[in-house]
Design a protein with these regions (language model features):
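TPR-adjacent "capping" and linker segments in tetratricopeptide-repeat scaffold/adaptor proteins
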Residues: 1-10
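TPR/TPR-like (Sel1-like) alpha-helical repeat modules
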Residues: 241-246, 264-291
Length: 292
């Protein structure tokens, strides 16, 4: 048994070296051999066995065989969940990897389950970066929204905001980005009063930064214009669309996708007000900028 444990250690070192030098097929073969040895040398709840399942799963994922990778990563995670006391860092790492994998495979419910496990474990670890938790909460919210569960999505946005504010304070640029996501969610839900309030806060944060992030400010002004546009306050919407366009034109000579969104929204507003010629002129101008 001792000899097999030593051989397992040697093989793991070898596969790490092979992986580091981009010799993926050889690394996978070494990982498969190491796993067979681990099954003989270690108990079914030993962390070394979990390591072997995990490493082979990672290599298969790197190869692009995500379906096969998932099976090995699930076996590793099952072992990690049985360890007492639990290793929260290992559970976080494993659940996070499975969440992103399931998400990429379109397995939404499993992805939500593993995102939630990773978030719960990550909350117990002091040095987990706030943006990692925020990204996972945002991903859960997107899955829930796509499946029509808007009410369930809102707490994810609110929790992400709480995490960012706790780590960074209320006036940080990253807090403004989270506020923007929340406000867009409220706009889509036609909760315009809440959306307006939060967009105004995000805009204020961005405008007070030095140097001011012009693209972010342009985005905030466009999003706020959408709120006013949606509830029929066309004068405010037009003013903000114009301001957003002006800022986008300062960002780059050629327009970005966001610039074209503002053009489209503003042109729709002008057309709805009977200003068809002005809307056409705006679209022609945008096409000229797009063509350089």
């Amino acid at each position: 048994m001792k000899g097999e444990e030593q051989l397992w250690t040697i093989l793991n070192d070898k596969l790490d070296m092979l992986r580091a030098t981009n010799r993926l097929p050889q690394a996978i073969r070494a990982a498969e051999t190491a796993l067979e040895i681990a099954k003989r040398a270690f108990s079914g709840t030993d962390l070394s066995l979990a390591t072997s399942f995990e490493k082979l799963g990672q290599l298969l994922d790197q190869k692009g065989d995500r379906a096969a990778a998932k099976g090995y990563l699930l076996k590793a995670h099952t072992i990690l969940e049985k360890v007492n006391p639990p290793d929260q860092r290992a559970i976080y790492r494993s659940a996070r990897r499975l969440a992103f994998l399931c998400d990429s495979l379109g397995q939404s419910e499993e992805a939500i389950n593993f995102y939630q496990k990773a978030i719960a474990a990550g909350a117990e670890i002091e040095d987990i970066h706030y943006s990692d938790l925020g990204t996972m909460l945002n991903n859960v919210a997107l899955i829930l929204r796509k499946s029509g569960r808007q009410k369930a999505a809102e707490p994810c946005y609110l929790r992400a905001l709480h995490i960012y504010e706790k780590q960074l304070g209320p006036d940080h640029v990253d807090v403004a980005s989270v506020l923007n996501n929340l406000a867009v969610f409220y706009t889509n839900e036609r909760r315009f009063t809440e959306a307006e309030k939060i967009h105004l806060r995000a805009l204020a944060i961005r405008e007070n930064l030095n140097p001011p992030p012009l693209a972010d400010i342009a985005q905030s002004k466009c999003n706020l214009a959408v709120v006013y546009h949606s509830r029929g306050d066309y004068a405010k919407a037009a003013e903000l669309y114009q301001a957003s366009l002006k800022m986008w034109e300062q960002v780059k000579d050629k327009p970005l996708k966001d610039y074209e969104i503002v053009v489209s929204n503003y042109a729709d507003l002008l057309s709805s007000l009977g200003q068809v010629r002005k809307a056409h002129q705006l679209e022609v101008r945008a096409r000229k900028k797009r063509s350089g």
